[in-house]
Each structure stands twice: as structure tokens, then as C-alpha cells.
Amino acid sequence: ESGEHESRQAQCIARWPMSGAFDLLAEQTHQCPFNLMLPFETPITQLNCHYNHTQVWLHTHLDIDWAIDAHDNDALAIYPSPPMQAVITALEQCGLSLYSADVERGQLRGGHFQSTIGCYQELEFRPNAWLSNLNELEVSFVTTAQQTHVLFEVDRKMRGDHYQTLSLPHTPIDIASLTAHLKQLLGL
């Protein structure tokens, strides 16, 4: 998604050169062991929601003259980190349901933090019936090595949007305390 226009297109979030040049004869195999660290902001793919439009894959490309199939895409399963999962669980305990997830092109800015990979993920939560003054809540995470920043876009009926931010350390989080804090912070 970009502005008001929705489309699907790939967004490269990192590149890693894997191997130098080598010769490969017919019927010969070549192994190239590797280990890599995904960017902290890699979008989550493993979410329990109605519409998950998030896909992350490892795209491999070999520079082979006249190759029939020199490309490959291997899907990756990206799970929420413990702070992300704590926020999702706390919002569910506040009476919200995770409805959809997508990735938007651009940079996310929230007070003292900003995204760095050229895109950011939005998780859309919708209220259960008893939270009738809320249209939706959009949540985006910007994770660093030290903490996870959260940007909340609160869309209220008849009152428009407003934003709140929260930063969580990468230490165990008490869900009951976080739930109470989010209720107050977001006016739930």
C-alpha cells in the first residue's frame, strides 16, 4: 500500500552476497552454507487474523548465462517477538480482535523512533461490539536491538484519528499490567 493506492509488489529489505564466482559442470552440485540475520523490522507473517497480506521470502538469484531457472523464492515464517506478542495479547484482552495485516511502502515515524527498511507493517484491530466508540486501531512495530517501539493509530467514530506511542524493553512483560496501561493510553 502506498498512500491511497493499494497494489502488491515486492520490497527488498536486505541483500546478502553469498558466494564468489565458481564453475559448475553438468550434473555437478555446489553447496554454499550460509547464516544470516534478518533485519529487526522484518514483517511478521505468522499471525492469526482474517486477512494476512504479509509475505516474506528469501529470493535467491544465480548469475548463470542462458539459465532456465536461476531464481528461487523460499517463504519464511516470521513470528512475533515476545514484546510484539505481548502487545497483541494485551489488545485482545482489551476487547479487540486482529482483523488484518499488510505492509506499506514508506517510512514510519513515531516521536523518537522511525523505521529503516523502506516499508512498515500495519496490524489492524477491530473492536468487539462493546467498544462501539472505536472504528479501528492500527498498530505498527519498529524493533531495535534494545527495545520494541509501537505506534498506535486510534480511529474513533466522530472524532477522527490520533496517535500514541509506546516503547517496550526486551525483557519479560507482565500482560495484566500492559493491558491496564494500554486501556489507559488508548482510552479503551
How does the language model describe each region?
Residues N35-E41, N48-A67:
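Internal, hydrophobic beta-strand segments that form the core of beta-sheet-rich folds
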Residues Q107-L188:
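C-terminal interaction module
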Residues E1-Q9, M158-R159:
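Short aromatic-acidic-glycine turn motif
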Residues T89-S115:
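Compositionally biased low-complexity segments at domain edges in trafficked proteins
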